[in-house]
Amino acid sequence: LHGFPELAWSWRKVMPALAAAGYHVIAPDQRGYGRTTGWSADYDGDLRPFRLLNAVRDAIGLVHALGYRQVAGVFGHDFGSPVAAWCALLRPDVFQSVALMSAPFGGPPALPFDTDRHKPKPATGPSIHAALAALPRPRKHYQWYYSTRPANEDMWHCPQGVHAFLRAYYHHKSADWAENRPYPLAG
């Protein structure tokens, strides 16, 4: 399951290796990506179809639509990681194993027992927005920014064109960008 801003096509170099190892591999476009349809693309549109459990249902439905009742595993990258994790957590009878990349999964949240007597504690710690704004070159948190109306407009109508926008986006995340400091993996 791909991440953001990606498509099933993102797995094109991984799929042959898995197939060569004997697996039947599929990589769908997740709901709202690629050529998927059935919801409003309007910024103010209903977001309920994009709830995490709907993405999990999509994965389970795809497995069943392809005629399987269980699969060897589900792989998730970036936004696909929590979807894959919840697939394996909620339906271990369907998804026999899980691999997660680029996004940690902390497990299910604790159940809110006794909330009538013990009110939830407010979040503590420094504000990420204040910390980023205080940098010598002020920045915005990308996930927060992507949820704003200006970001929506930027992505739908990039002045430089979609190709140049995505090329710059991926360059900014790459080891080729001078301000990015990747660290080699041990082993």
Language-model features: locations:
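Conserved HGGG/HGGXW glycine-rich cap/lid loop of the alpha/beta-hydrolase fold
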Residues: L1-A41, H77-P82
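Flexible "cap/lid" subdomain of the alpha/beta-hydrolase fold that forms the substrate-access gate
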Residues: Y33-F75, S81-G187
